[in-house]
């Protein structure tokens, strides 16, 4: 999927009408008192790491739309989705007011999309980091050329409520989980539906409630993991849509399912569960649990090949913490963030962790 114009211009696109807007540098704002407290409260318990440096701030700033009818009460738009580029220090964040922002390594930011519908998922492509796939709460799936902000193509899902999105490693397939209990797999080149996993009627046949997390196994292109509000984790062979593993476990209410090697993570909305770790070779009970005392809304493994670090974020205690599956306690992070943490992602090298919160700020951890 190649864009017509591959130059790195600064054109920003709102719907289909490109306009020229200067890139905004957001390095100037100073930390608020709350953010200063967060920085000084950040804890590193992991001496094996040479450094863990917390930096906040990529504060939400809207250079174009001063008046937002969706943002009643004057609150900052919330960050619901984050994706970090494979081989560059570029981060995409999706907001509750429909904006998508791109941040580069120089801490510049530009707006590339404004849909006025909440962005619930987005992914920068693995094979071409100039393309981003996003989905809105009303089912608009869009492929965007990041440097220019131009839409490459889009399609709309009708009569269903999407909750989550993931891309295959080759970026040729999009998987979407729905509030109605369905999972749909689309061809990303033709924007056509290829596979449909219907709502289950029993434990053995699928989900019976909202699906909030679906993820392709990046080491096995035929495998998919899903989790939902029905407290079920399911493993799927997408070649024949066969359910090859199932367990009653975490109550998944956000993007809290991930897989790495034989290990499967499930972050739970129930504070007593925290984050549960499973081994797919004996997929019956969790092999370990990690206490958080919070409602977990995001959970991801580090993408570095030779470690098994993961991070989780949520609310109640408004935390973001990172864990090593071989250690008992968290290794770095903090409680008492200014607002709930709804989304996070690691860079491919595992040296950057970005997480987004309900106050519109994108926080960064250099590892």
Predicted stretch roles:
Residues 343-367:
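Blade-level signature of beta-propeller repeat domains, shared across WD40, Kelch, NHL, RCC1
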Residues 71-74, 112-115, 155-158, 203-206, ...:
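Surface loop/turn motifs at the tips and blade-to-blade linkers of beta-strand repeat domains
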Residues 267-270, 289-325:
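Loop/turn-rich, solvent-exposed surfaces of beta-rich toroidal or solenoidal domains
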Residues 87-89, 129-130, 170-172, 219-222, ...:
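Short coil/turn segments that connect the beta-strands within blades of beta-propeller domains
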Residues 76-84, 116-125, 160-167, 202-217, ...:
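Canonical WD40 repeat/beta-propeller blade segments in eukaryotic WD-repeat proteins
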Residues 1-90, 94-101, 264:
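Intrinsically disordered, low-complexity acidic/Ser/Thr/Pro-rich linker and tail segments
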Residues 94-97, 135-138, 177-180, 188, ...:
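Conserved strand-to-loop turn within each blade of WD40 beta-propeller repeats
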Residues 100-104, 141-146, 183-188, 233-238, ...:
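WD40-repeat beta-propellers
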